[in-house]
Amino acid sequence: MLLLIQSSVLGQKPRARDIGIPFNGTTGKFNAITDVKGVEVGYSTIISGQGKNVRGKGPVRTGVTAILPRGKNNNPVFANWYSLNGNGEMTGTTWITESGFLETPIMITNTNSVGVVRDAVLKWFVKT
């Protein structure tokens, strides 16, 4: 029911079109996922502390991104998934494989936060 993807992006990377990879069609106004009607994206980032990392004290650099394929409409969307290299946590893929549907937001976070993000989304989902 819930799809969590580990994020490993360390910096801004060029977009495919920017480096000459061709795609059919035209981009939306912002060339972003939010150009798709009904899609909503939200995020939260925590940055705390500076200097050398001290275990248990920081500094902290973490966050979570939520993608709601149909916005606040909870109707399922057709879905599938693909594992590029098997690294990271992909919670919820069994349901997608069995049903072919995604019924919850797509959450992107670090591996250590997968459990707490899953729990928070399920609490939110029950309330809506």
What annotation goes with each model-predicted range?
Residues 11-128:
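Alpha/propeptide regions of enzymes that mature by internal proteolysis
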Residues 1-12:
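Bacterial Sec-dependent N-terminal signal peptides
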